[in-house]
Design a protein with these regions (language model features):
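N-terminal start-of-chain detector that recognizes signal peptides
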Residues: 1-5, 51, 60-66
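N- or domain-start disorder-to-order transition segments that initiate the globular core
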Residues: 1-26
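A short linear-motif detector with a strong N-terminal bias
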Residues: 6-11, 54-56, 68-72
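Short, polar/flexible loop-turn hinges at active-site or ligand-entry regions and domain interfaces
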Residues: 54-57, 98-102, 121-131
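M16 family metallopeptidases and their MPP-like homologs
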Residues: 18, 24-43, 61-117, 121, ...
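Active-site SXXK
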Residues: 44-53
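Short, surface-exposed recognition loops or helix-turn segments adjacent to catalytic cores
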Residues: 127-139, 154
Length: 154
């Protein structure tokens, strides 16, 4: 394995990569670390979910999923975790390694660009706010997820 490579993409934002040719998939993650507070914890969880669903270029879930399908079935996930006194929000894209694509498609570049657009070109209105109907949907989905976890018998 090569040494880590670091690329600065914006002020305070760096990409650290560890190239390896032994895997059939690529994993690309973006993490945000924020102070944990009762006031912002649920908002941050909603924000991560909203970012992982659509972008300006792919404003509906259907269009977003179609783009993922075009990337040989790539997937995007988000997670929110407590890390000490901080909250860690992570967006992850998983895609087929370019070596396994037809006609030398650059799947990893497209997956990376999609991940970047989720953060830097989010599906927000002219005031930089998420659309109310999207917020309501994510609140409902998050509440359903929490309820199902509470009701799960282990």
């Amino acid at each position: 394995m090569k040494d880590f490579e670091t690329i600065c993409v914006a002020s305070g934002v760096q990409i650290v990569s560890a190239p390896a040719n032994r895997f059939k998939t690529n994993e690309i993650s973006i993490s945000f670390c924020t102070p944990l507070s009762a006031k912002t914890a649920s908002r941050n969880a909603l924000c991560a979910n909203l970012l992982a669903r659509t972008t300006k270029k792919y404003p509906t879930l259907s269009e977003f999923n179609k783009k993922l399908a075009m990337l040989y079935g790539a997937s995007v996930t988000c997670s929110v975790a407590k890390l000490g006194e901080n909250q860690l929000l992570t967006l992850n894209a998983s895609s087929l390694d370019d070596r396994f694509s037809f006609e030398n498609d650059k799947i990893s570049v497209d997956a990376f660009n999609l991940l970047m657009s989720m953060v830097f070109d989010a599906n927000v209105d002219e005031n930089g706010l998420f659309y109310p109907q999207d917020i309501d949907r994510e609140k409902r989905l998050l509440a359903e997820k929490i309820e199902s976890e509470e009701n799960e018998k282990r």
